[in-house]
Amino acid sequence: MGKIKTLYLIRNAKSDWNDIGASDFERGITKKGKKDMETMSSYLFLKNVIPDIILSSCSLRAQQTTDILVDKLNYSDKVEYLQELYYTPTQTLFELIAMQDAAYETVFVVGHNPQLTDIANLLIDEHISKIPSSGIVSINFDIQEWSEIVYKKGVVDFFIIPKQFKYYVPKQIRTLLEK
């Protein structure tokens, strides 16, 4: 038996399609995207989720999403912005996860669809139809090292999406959002 390692697949916050002059890579997030990611990040904070490392796509919207996570989690450790996370083949993403340091118990990957949904479905023995903007999937693995990760052996701890908080935001999260 190994110990539990947890992977958080975090889709970038809702991006702005109205800036016609911006390339896909340069699109930033919307006000709604910012608000949604602040809510999701506050949820992680209340669950005492702190990553050992954040791996983020280097697109503008992923960087802005990561900035919100860093701020709301009071995180000041390792953040790596990787070109490989910008619309990479799923197998490359799998290999990137498998290469993480064995000392890391909790790894965040901030990226894009369809790659995040595809990798989630490869890693778990269930089916997620889509990870929406600002959606977060937490997957546990009973392994000692990330290199031991295999398809279909991950177990979903939780899957949260902004719409869960559309009509009701718990008081603890509201308090954090007001800070």
Where are these regions (language model features)?
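Non-DNA-binding regulatory cores of transcription-related proteins
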Residues: 100-108, 113-135
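Active-site-proximal alpha-helix that buttresses catalytic centers in soluble enzyme cores
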Residues: 2-6, 10-88, 116, 130-131, ...
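Short, surface-exposed amphipathic charged segments that create phosphate/polyanion-binding patches used
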Residues: 94-99, 173-175
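Short, glycine/charged-enriched secondary-structure capping and boundary segments
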Residues: 22-25, 68-72, 94-97, 122-126, ...
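Conserved histidine-centered catalytic loops in small-molecule metabolism enzymes
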Residues: 52-72, 147-179
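Short alpha-helix plus adjacent loop in nuclease-associated cores
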Residues: 85-97
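Domain-level recognition of soluble alpha/beta enzyme cores
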Residues: 127-159
